[in-house]
C-alpha cells in the first residue's frame, strides 16, 4: 500500500515513482511474454509457502577467503553476527539507517538502473522492490579492497518474506569482491544496483539453494564506465523456484561484463536465468555463459539478450547456454537473442541440451 512507503528522505522520490510504475504495470503473471517459461505465482501470491529451516552451515563457506562478514537474519541486519571493521577506502552502511537522511550519494544510484531496465521490458518485481525495500547494504569503494565482503543470509522463520536492496558504487580504478551465500528467506525479492566508474572492477560470487523449498527472485542492475570490469557467477543447487535477472549497460569504451552461472536441479526444481546486456560504447565485451544439470523432472530456463547500439562498434558479445538432462522428464528451455545495430561487431549465441551418451 502507498501508505507504507517512505515519504521523507533522499529515496522518497524514487520510491514514489516506483510505486506508481508498479501500480500501472501490475505484478507479473504467466501471461506476460517475459514470464513465458516461469510462472511468477509463488513470487507474487499473498500466501508464503513454508520453507523448513536449513541445517547447513553456510556461514563457513567462504571462511578461507578471510572475508568481512555482514549477516542478515530474516532480512534484518544482525550486528552481533557481523564483523566490526575499519578498512581504508571502504564504506558500508545500512539502508534502513541512511534512509532517514535528507541527502546521500546513494540517491544518484537508487532506482536509477532498475528504472532504466524497464525501458526494454517491464520488471514489476524490481520496481516493487524499489518502492518498498527498507534494508540492505550501501557500499562505497574508493580503493582496491584486498579482503572480500561476504554477505551471509540466515532465516529463523519458516514463512519469512524478505525484500532486500543492495547499492554499490565503485570509484575510478577501485576494486571490490562480493560474496553472497545462505538461505535468506522462504521467499526473497532482492535487487542489487552497481555503478562502476572508469577502470573499476567488481567481482561477484553467490551460492543459492541447497534447500528445495525456497522461492527466490534476484535482480542485478548496473552501469559500466570506460575499461570497467564486471564479473558475476552464481551457483544454484535446488530450490522450488529461482529467478535470477541481470540487466547491464556498458556505457564506457573497452569495458567488459561477464555473467555466468551453473545449477544442479532435482525434482520440482525450476531455475531461470534471464540476462540483458546493452552495448553502448566502442570496443566493449560481454559474455553470458550458463550450464545446468537437471534430473527427476527439473526445469531449467535461459533467456539471454545482447543489444548492440549503432555507436557500439567493435563489440565482442557471446552467449552460450548448455544443459545436461539426466532423464526424459527434465526439460531445458532457451531463448537466446541478438539485436545488433552496428556493422563492425563479433557477436554469436548458442544453446544445446542433451543426455549422457550410453
Regions found by a protein language model. Give the residues of each.
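N-terminal amphipathic, basic helical "cap/leader" segment at the start of enzyme domains
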Residues: 1-130, 289-295
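Conserved beta-strand/loop scaffold segments within soluble protein domains that form the structured core
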Residues: 98, 108-358
Amino acid at each position: 500500500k502507498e501508505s507504507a512507503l517512505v515519504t521523507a528522505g533522499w529515496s522518497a522520490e524514487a520510491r514514489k515513482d516506483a510505486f506508481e510504475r508498479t501500480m500501472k504495470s501490475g505484478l507479473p503473471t504467466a501471461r506476460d511474454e517475459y514470464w513465458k517459461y516461469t510462472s511468477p505465482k509463488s513470487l507474487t501470491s499473498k500466501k508464503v509457502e513454508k520453507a523448513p529451516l536449513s541445517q547447513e552451515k553456510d556461514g563457513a563457506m567462504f571462511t578461507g577467503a578471510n572475508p568481512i562478514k555482514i549477516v542478515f537474519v530474516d532480512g534484518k541486519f544482525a550486528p552481533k553476527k557481523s564483523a566490526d571493521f575499519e578498512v581504508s577506502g571502504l564504506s558500508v552502511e545500512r539502508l534502513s539507517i541512511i534512509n532517514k537522511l535528507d541527502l546521500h550519494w546513494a540517491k544518484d544510484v537508487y532506482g536509477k538502473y532498475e528504472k532504466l531496465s524497464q525501458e526494454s521490458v517491464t520488471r514489476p518485481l524490481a520496481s516493487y522492490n524499489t518502492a518498498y525495500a527498507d534494508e540492505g547494504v550501501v557500499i562505497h569503494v574508493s580503493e582496491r579492497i584486498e579482503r572480500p565482503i561476504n554477505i551471509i543470509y540466515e532465516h529463523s522463520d519458516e514463512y519469512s518474506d524478505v525484500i532486500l536492496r543492495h547499492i554499490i558504487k565503485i570509484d575510478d580504478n577501485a576494486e571490490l569482491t562480493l560474496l553472497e551465500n545462505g538461505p535468506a528467506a522462504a521467499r526473497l525479492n532482492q535487487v542489487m544496483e552497481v555503478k562502476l566508474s572508469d577502470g573499476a572492477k567488481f567481482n561477484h560470487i553467490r551460492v543459492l539453494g541447497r534447500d528445495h523449498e525456497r522461492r527466490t527472485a534476484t535482480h542485478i542492475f548496473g552501469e559500466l564506465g570506460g575499461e570497467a570490469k564486471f564479473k558475476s557467477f552464481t551457483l544454484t543447487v535446488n530450490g522450488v523456484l529461482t529467478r535470477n535477472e541481470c540487466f547491464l549497460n556498458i556505457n564506457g569504451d573497452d569495458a567488459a561484463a561477464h555473467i555466468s552461472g551453473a545449477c544442479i536441479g532435482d525434482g520440482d526444481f525450476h531455475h531461470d536465468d534471464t540476462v540483458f546486456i546493452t552495448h553502448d560504447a566502442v570496443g566493449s565485451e560481454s559474455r553470458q555463459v550458463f550450464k545446468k544439470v537437471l534430473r527427476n523432472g527439473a526445469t531449467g530456463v535461459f533467456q539471454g539478450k545482447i543489444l548492440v547500439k549503432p555507436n557500439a562498434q567493435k563489440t565482442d558479445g557471446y552467449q552460450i547456454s548448455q544443459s545436461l538432462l539426466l532423464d526424459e522428464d527434465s526439460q531445458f528451455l532457451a531463448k537466446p537473442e541478438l539485436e545488433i545495430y552496428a556493422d563492425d561487431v563479433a557477436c554469436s549465441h548458442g544453446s544445446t541440451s542433451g543426455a549422457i551418451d550410453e
